[in-house]
Every structure is written in C-alpha cells, then in structure tokens.
Regions:
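S-adenosyl-L-methionine
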Residues: 165-177
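Core catalytic lobe of class I
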Residues: 1-162
Length: 177
C-alpha cells in the first residue's frame, strides 16, 4: 500500500489454489477489487492425472486502494479499440506463451505478452512506473518497455533474473534503433 500511488492499481494472477485467499487478503488490507478477469487458455496443458476437469483458466484480480478520492485510470477506449470496437469483457481468451517468447529460457508460469499488453495498456500511460515484485522471466518489463513505461522488476531466483535480463537487454537494443 505504501508504494502504490493513490490512483494506482494492482494486478494479481493466480490459480484456484491461491487466488481466493489473495482476494480476501486484498479486501482485508482495504483494497477494492475492480475486476475479476478470467484468462481462458485455448491450449491448456493436458490433465495427466484424469481425476478432475482440465485446468484451463487463471484468474486475474485488478484492485485499487479503497479510498474515496482514489480514482484509478482505465483506458476504456483503447481497450475497446483493441477488441474490434466492442467493449472488452472480463473473460480473455488466448493461448499459452508462444515458444518465440521463451527464447531466453524457460519459466514455469511465464505469461504471454498479449496478456501483459492488455493489463499495462488498460491501466497505465506512457512514462508511468510498473512494478512487478515477482518478475520471473521479465514479460512485464518487456511489454512495459515496448509501450514507453518505466519498469522495476524483483525476483528471488537468479536463474529467472538472468532470463529477464536477457529479454530486457534485447528490447532495450530494439528501442534504441
């Protein structure tokens, strides 16, 4: 809460194993959940155990501080434009991360760039700072850089930080052209 600006927002992605307790924790910490977005994966990993339905979705919570004067940014028109002129709904359908986005190394929960593109473009403007305290392979940083946002990434795994650094170095070189 301390580093989030009054109009800033927080996005958290999770599976059924954790997202509900995260939602409760957000509310206990006086955050207001703006949206509960379902990412419907068009190519989920197979259900090898065959003891439940195939896990084909993840939930993304979008929240802000629950303060009367806190007005968050939502780039409604841009989201509508990205969705073929129609209102964007809270179910986002798309594939898992493409192999071309994993060239720098593998991360078990790497998100596809199109997913972070929607998140970043929906709730930030050029020059804004995007913080990812679990940056993993750096997808948030890559997309932030592509769209003129500043990025701060944190992770506790050196191997994943190396992957993120390689990806961020490549985007930085491309942007300097």
């Amino acid at each position: 809460r301390r580093v989030l600006k009054p109009g800033g927002t927080i996005w958290i992605s999770g599976t059924l194993h954790s997202i509900y307790s995260i939602g409760v924790a957000l509310q206990q910490e006086l955050y207001k959940i703006i949206n509960n977005i379902t990412w419907k994966k068009t190519n989920p990993p197979p259900n090898l155990a065959c003891r439940c339905f195939t896990h084909s979705t993840e939930t993304i919570l979008w929240a802000r501080k629950d303060e009367k004067k806190a007005r968050h940014l939502f780039n409604y028109e841009q989201m509508k434009q990205m969705n073929g002129g129609k209102q964007m709904k809270d179910v986002w359908e798309g594939s898992l991360t493409r192999p071309s986005e994993k060239w720098a190394g593998r991360h078990p929960t790497q998100k596809p760039e199109y997913l972070l593109e929607r998140i970043i473009l929906a709730s930030t403007k050029k020059g804004d700072v995007v913080l990812d305290p679990f940056c993993g392979s750096g997808t948030t940083g890559v997309v932030s850089g592509k769209y003129g946002r500043q990025f701060i990434g944190i992770d506790n795994n050196e191997e994943y930080l190396d992957i993120a650094k390689r990806r961020l170095d490549q985007i930085q070189e491309a942007l300097e052209w």
